[in-house]
């Protein structure tokens, strides 16, 4: 054992990914010897994100080993060309045998090891199929031991279930040092990197990206992108300040109110809680005297974001009344406030 005061801080200096948004979420960069888990829906951009991070680390720090059990080397090359990635220090291996991958990593001593994905890996010591609980547990345990002994930071990609949880044993999240979720709607360009667990930093920071043709582009000022196409000549639009972690973001909310053609009016919410919308409409009708019982009401949060803060109630109510009365909300106005009964 080593006395705590004798441990040099320089020995745990962080490695920057040169992605400001990712470094923000990680607490300043990658900690050597850390085991990190990245989860997210299929097709959301997890592999794209880690390929771009691998390129940056390879260019600025040293060799990176990217091990894929889901794509061949040719498929990885095609993806890399689309992302304009062509670094000689980025080494790729297409294999599902974790023992062989760790042998290669031990010989190379890379500055970063990426496993894509943990559900495709297996070890011959366990008599079970890849992706099973026992295989995922054992493979993660070996990766944890390897990265701690060699002081090599390692990122593993994990699939998620229909409920949004990372597939595999629950203890998987307890074994790793950092758990990140990559979220967003596939039909929208915005992506959010969220920290669920971080032994080396805060879990209240988020990173925001846009999926473009060349890959993921970090957004240091997401408010400008979210409000870029807002019209100042249309009613039913308002701006809120939405807290994503500890990060305030300006977001546009929209509303459309039309006379219903059926007996029961429709209430539809995209990115906003439907129950809160129903409460808002009841308050507007009872307390403010607006007739909404014969109106279909549709509300939407721009960018595919989901807002669930009570402080967004008032801006949504203003957007609804704005469209109902065809009155335009000033573009330089931000509306905040919780609406009670």
Regions found by a protein language model. Give the residues of each.
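Conserved P-loop NTPase/AAA+ ATPase motor core
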Residues: 205-340
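Conserved nucleotide-binding/hydrolysis micro-motifs of P-loop NTPases
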Residues: 42-44, 70-74, 82-85, 96-100, ...
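P-loop NTPase nucleotide-binding/switch module
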Residues: 1-29, 121-129, 217-220, 227-233
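Residue-level signature of catalytic and energy-coupling elements of molecular machines
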Residues: 25, 76, 116, 158, ...
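Phosphate-binding/switch region of NTP-binding enzymes
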Residues: 144-231
